[in-house]
């Protein structure tokens, strides 16, 4: 399969092309059945699987060799910020891009989770600071029922009530 433009092969073209309602990934004018990942087409990133645009795909997808984005229904959703599940792990996405630098809390369907370096950390138990308030996290989940002493870092103890440190103690 070759990409023809104005009755001639265009060896320089790499991108998507529509053929009878199906979108295919073409690389240097040749259909690339081995390509799986994201491609940019007129400013929108689309998910291609085995050379064909997959409109049913939702999840993380790779652009190039090191950029991960959140795609929904085959296209990158630029306004999404939150968690996404991929290959058995949960990752933090900010404005559709996986953010390896984020450490803090994030709300996902009403539950607050602790993210460390872009990945949900199920092993974390202790206090974390979120917008000036310290919250108690247990096994990666904010525990609103916790009341008692809690450790921040390696040597700072605070009293938490209902999952948050009260500054008036």
Predicted regions and their residues:
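Extracellular adhesion/carbohydrate-binding repeat motifs centered on closely spaced tryptophans
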Residues: 1-169
């Amino acid at each position: 399969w070759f990409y023809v433009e104005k009755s001639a092969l265009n060896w320089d073209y790499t991108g998507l092309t529509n053929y009878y309602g199906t979108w295919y990934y073409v690389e240097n004018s040749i259909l690339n059945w081995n390509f799986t990942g994201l491609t940019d087409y007129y400013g929108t990133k689309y998910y291609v699987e085995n050379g064909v645009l997959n409109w049913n795909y939702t999840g993380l997808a790779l652009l190039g060799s090191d950029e991960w984005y959140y795609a929904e229904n085959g296209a990158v959703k630029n306004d999404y910020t939150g968690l996404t599940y991929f290959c058995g792990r949960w990752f933090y996405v900010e404005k559709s891009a996986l953010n390896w630098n984020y450490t803090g809390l994030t709300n996902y369907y009403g539950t607050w989770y602790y993210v460390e370096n872009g990945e949900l950390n199920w092993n974390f138990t202790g206090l974390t600071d979120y917008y000036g308030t310290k919250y108690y996290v247990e096994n990666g989940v904010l525990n609103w029922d916790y009341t008692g002493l809690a450790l921040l870092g390696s040597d700072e103890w605070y009293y938490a009530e209902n999952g948050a440190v009260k500054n008036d103690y």
